[in-house]
Swiss-Prot record:
Segments of this protein annotated with the region Disordered: 177-204, 609-635
Coiled coil start-end: none
Protein name listed in UniProt: RNA polymerase sigma factor RpoD
HAMAP family referenced in this protein's UniProt entry, alphabetically: Sigma70_RpoD_SigA (MF_00963)
DNA-binding region in chain numbering: 581-600
Region annotated Sigma-70 factor domain-3, chain positions: 465-542
Pfam families: Sigma70_ner (PF04546), Sigma70_r1_1 (PF03979), Sigma70_r1_2 (PF00140), Sigma70_r2 (PF04542), Sigma70_r3 (PF04539), Sigma70_r4 (PF04545)
Amino acid sequence: MSNSNIDNDLDKIDSLLKKAKSKKIPVTYDDINKALPLNKNPSIRQLEEAILKFSDAGVDILESNEDDEIKLDIGMDEEFKLSTNVDNEPEDEVEEENIGTTDDPVRLYLKDMGGVDLLTRENEVEIAKRIEEGRKTMTASLCKSPIAMRCFIVWYEDLVNEKMLLRDLIDLEANMLHDETPENDEEHSSETEGEEHEDNHLSMSRVETQILPNIIERMKKISFICEELLIEAKKCYEKSFEPKVLQNSKKYNNNLELLINEVSEIHFNSKRTEEILGKMYGINRDLINKEIAFLKLAEKYGVTRQNFLDEYIGSVINAAWKEKMLKNKKVAWKELITKESDYIDQMIAELSVIESNTGLLVNDFKKLVNTIQKSERQTLQAKKDMIEANLRLVISIAKKYANRGLQFLDLIQEGNIGLMKAVDKFEYRRGYKFSTYATWWIRQAITRAIADQARTIRIPVHMIETINKILRTSRQMLNELGYEPTATEIANRLSMPLDKVRKVMKIAKEPISLENPVGDDSDGGQLGDFIEDKNAVAPIDAAIQSNLREVTTRVLATLTPREERVLRMRFGIGMNTDHTLEEVGQQFKVTRERIRQIESKALRKLQHPIRSKKLNSFRSGGKRGEGNPSDLLEA
């Protein structure tokens, strides 16, 4: 790209900034996006720099600009409309340019995000009601399934017998924050935002201890109701295997209503719900596969698809159905039932096993699964609508945490995770707008991700919280005392053990690169050049070892070959390890005593003044052990 084009791109950004400052009007993300260079894909850093440039200049950046009116949500339900005349400026080339085709993920994300309308308070309530209705339908449907009833009973027993942790059964966060109201305080400093969850967040173990008795009591009641329902269902089916008999049972319906109310009060862990759904969906897939196989078999005998569906769907597949189809007027059905009698008997037996496992007739089970799937789709679609409409909120919060160790897109993704949690736990009846509620979750997700991922060497989040507390106290004491407080003073202020304070302050140090330049000159070298290598051999030691090796070889050469070999093996000279008398004896095929005698004789020869004076000079400088030849003089 030529220099003139680059200057032109910079002029567009500066022009937009100058106009916004002079007219004291805010800009939108679309304005910045259009002002970015079109002839090349801007990097994430360029987008961050552009956003920060406007923020530093005091220009507000809003999420959207629709029909020349920008709606700002202030507090709960107040809305102020600010009229902007940006589109009325004919000389503004920024507004006239089109984004065009691009494969840059940042631009595509902003473009798609801008295509979703913002939600009013009424829209948020309507979507929240859709989510609530879908959940209620799913809960009621699950409670009608004997599979779920058996799971509730097993979960209660595992919880009482300590085979299951409470956190594995329920959603602790939903219970932890049930009585909390997160405030959307925009005046919090960035430092406080990064640390606020430290004082407000209870540990999982503490929360479990607090709510465990209440959950056990509820699960005990649920387990008892489930046992009553299963017994009542068994009695009804023993009298008559007809669904209407059970549906008309007053006792069964009363207990079922109680079960639905109790289960609705507990926020079960998503994994526990998926466990029940997984079992039901698995059985449903088996049924579908059996029906498809039966349909293909029927088509081979000339039964049309529509005729098969008319006779199969809604019918109870048993021996009576088989007899009925034998009397069918259509020849194809008679031929199918007659020739495939064994296959149909086997299928009836398999369906009977499924009915026994599910506690429901096949048709009732399929209807129940269809209802659950429909409510699940309804809930997911409503959540999707709420999430997509609030993606702008994530960006507005994420930009405050730029240059904290994570890239801008990573901050957005972490914020989106917090947004999804906020949608799951949003309670519209409290009267707050969703943005007020979601801000806390988005901020928590981003700060937790920065604490968990921003450092080169990962530090656990709970340790990050302790580091922040100590650093904050250190700054406060610096302002009070006028000098840097010592570790002892910080420990006394926080009532924390001195060793822990020192350990945390040591961990808090940021790692630096060994390639960092030292000094102002280019020839000053790198930091790694000044760090001692503990494993490297000093030149003087290397020279001594080389000389010792040569002298030892000459001294041992004065012995007989057998004596030299025995000493080398016994002391590991020139070998990887030393050898025992037994091992040396096996090599020479003699006894241990004979090897000891040879060794003693050889050592006496080495202690002769003529030979020993050549090794005496190494006795003070050499290291003992590990095959050091100077050890021969001590033996």
